[in-house]
Amino acid sequence: MRDAETQGLVLYSRNYKEKDKLVKIFTESFGKRMFFVKNFGKSSYASSLQAFTDGKLTATINDGGFSFIEDVSEVVVYKNISADIFINAHASYIISLADAAISDNQYDPALYGFLKRSLELLDQGFDMEVVTNIFELQVLHRFGVSLNFSECAFCHKTVGPFDFSYKFSGCLCPRHFDEDLRRSHLDPNVIYLINLFQEISLDELKKISIKAEMKAKIRQFIDGLYDEYVGIHLKSKKFLDGMSGWADIMK
């Protein structure tokens, strides 16, 4: 065990015994850790350990079991995420995705920063689907998946239009469409936007407008990539998918 200070983002918590809780926190310095909080309801920092909060932790880090929190300060609460069920669903999904992407205790400050920035953008009102798509695509390599959407897999032509081939795990230009008769037959704009989302920095992201029809095509394609190359099935993703018809009902 060692005492340390680190930034930490609360992923989730669950009850443990009658009055205690286990709180999973993605720390900047020590990766994802499970913290034991005794008498959670009476804890002076219980409100700082809710979902969608980030803060500075003073803690005892244990590599072989539960870690322990001494204090939480400089707390940031993503209030808009907590208040809006649709933003909340997208945030919950990317948190689950980050949790699945690396092992517990694995040091990954880049992923911590990427997740934190994604939540900040969601909280600031950036397009939920766009932020989520960017996160999904840029976290793929942590699942061991490396896909190139910027050029033809055969001739390396970098000017589209392109289609995607699962057979070759890459893009095809029109000259090489015949190499895979079962290619995806995508709208060329899907590949263009997928490549953009895979490469863009969240710090460069500006508020953009994408039509619902195009968003649906992108969603379907990314789902296909995850089914083919990753193979995880998260409850948060299933819940998010089930919300597709809610917007019209709640108007």
UniProtKB/Swiss-Prot annotation:
A Pfam family it matches: RecO_C
UniProt xrefs under InterPro entries: ARFGAP/RecO, DNA_rep/recomb_RecO_N, NA-bd_OB-fold, RecO, RecO_C
Keyword Zinc: no
An example Gene Ontology biological process: DNA recombination
Cellular compartments per GO CC: bacterial nucleoid
Keywords tagged on the record: DNA damage, DNA recombination, DNA repair
Function summary: Involved in DNA repair and RecF pathway recombination.
Similarity annotation: Belongs to the RecO family.
NCBIfam families documented for this protein: reco
Name this polypeptide is given: DNA repair protein RecO
